[in-house]
């Protein structure tokens, strides 16, 4: 059908009616649950043949039930036939959507919005404004003391205003409150893997023993019977110079003897600068901290 010109798939609005184009797509299903036509053979849900079969089946079913013959099978053939009749439609200059509420079909409401904004002032709502101001606010809502209802010919329709009895004014608005329950912690943040927040501080004097040697410096610190700390500092000064590095490189190795049972050397801090290379090691007794 597609190759013979009897079936078309159009991506766009094709409705033709006295009111012009109203953005309605051509379709043969009315339940709005039709699957889209997937015409890319690379897609896993390619369904051109399936949709063609559905359309043909729907057309045959409609013809058998309603005894209607489709003389124009495609929008293009229908349009060509309309052009062939050489029929001219009168020029339409009034509202294309007279029964709709489109923004370009109704009167402008900006002035009414301004008047309503003024009427929502707290004095206007409670009636505590001056009498002259109250009259002015009422006139702005009406916009004219000679306002009337007119028919399609512009003639005034006879009308009468009847007072409403037992009128209740709904609330002007509402507020929503959300209550959250939270527990306040004065510390602000608990201790974790990257932050240590002690529950207090210890004030006291620790016993220090300082060993100062030509290569190694040590500080022994006894805080209490079960807290004992040793801080060692080793300085290695090895100046190099006067040789060419084009044929190789200079490597410096350090061999550190074991400290004893359960103690290890750990690189706790390192910073590489131009000269020298600073490494700091600390003795650790905890295997997990190695």
From Swiss-Prot:
Inhibited by swainsonine but not by 1-desoxymannojirimycin. GO terms for biological process: mannose metabolic process. Dimer. Optimum temperature is 65 degrees Celsius. Activity decreases sharply above 70 degrees Celsius. Coiled coil: none annotated. Glycans are attached at residue 64. Binds 1 zinc ion per subunit. The keyword Repressor does not apply. The keyword Glycoprotein applies. Keywords: Glycoprotein, Glycosidase, Hydrolase, Metal-binding, Zinc. Its EC number is 3.2.1.24. This is Alpha-mannosidase. The active site is at 17 (nucleophile). It comes from the Eukaryota. It is an enzyme of class 3 (hydrolase). GO terms for molecular function: alpha-mannosidase activity; carbohydrate binding; metal ion binding. Its cofactor is Zn(2+). Liberates mannose from p-nitrophenyl-alpha-D-mannoside. Optimum pH is 5. Belongs to the glycosyl hydrolase 38 family. It catalyses: Hydrolysis of terminal, non-reducing alpha-D-mannose residues in alpha-D-mannosides. InterPro entries: Gal_mutarotase_sf_dom, Glyco_hydro/deAcase_b/a-brl, Glyco_hydro_38_cen_sf, Glyco_hydro_57/38_cen_sf, Glycosyl_Hydrlase_38.
């Amino acid at each position: 059908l597609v190759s013979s010109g009897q079936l078309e798939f159009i991506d766009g609005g094709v409705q033709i009616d006295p009111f012009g184009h109203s953005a309605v797509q051509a379709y043969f299903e009315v339940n709005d649950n039709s699957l889209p036509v997937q015409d890319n053979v690379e897609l896993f849900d390619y369904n051109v043949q399936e949709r063609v079969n559905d359309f043909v089946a729907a057309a045959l079913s409609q013809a058998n039930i309603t005894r209607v013959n489709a003389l124009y099978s495609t929008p293009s053939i229908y349009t060509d036939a309309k052009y062939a009749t050489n029929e001219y439609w009168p020029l339409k200059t009034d509202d294309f959507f007279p029964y709709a509420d489109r923004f370009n079909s109704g009167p402008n409401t900006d002035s009414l919005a301004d008047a309503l904004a003024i009427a929502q002032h707290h004095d206007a709502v409670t009636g505590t404004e001056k009498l002259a101001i109250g009259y002015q606010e009422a006139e702005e809502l009406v916009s004219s003391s000679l306002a009337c209802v007119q028919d399609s010919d512009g003639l005034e329709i006879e009308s009468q205003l009847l007072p409403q009895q037992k009128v209740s004014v709904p609330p002007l608005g509402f507020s929503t409150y959300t209550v959250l329950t939270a527990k306040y912690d004065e510390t602000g943040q608990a201790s974790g893997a990257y932050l240590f927040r002690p529950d207090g501080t210890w004030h006291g004097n620790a016993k220090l023993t300082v060993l100062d040697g030509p290569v190694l410096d040590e500080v022994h610190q006894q805080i209490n019977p079960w807290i004992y700390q040793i801080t060692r500092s080793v300085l290695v000064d090895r100046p190099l110079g006067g040789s060419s590095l084009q044929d190789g490189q200079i490597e410096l190795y350090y061999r550190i003897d074991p400290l004893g049972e359960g103690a290890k050397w750990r690189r706790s801090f390192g910073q590489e600068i131009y000269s020298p290379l600073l490494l700091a090691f600390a003795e650790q007794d905890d295997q997990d901290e190695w």
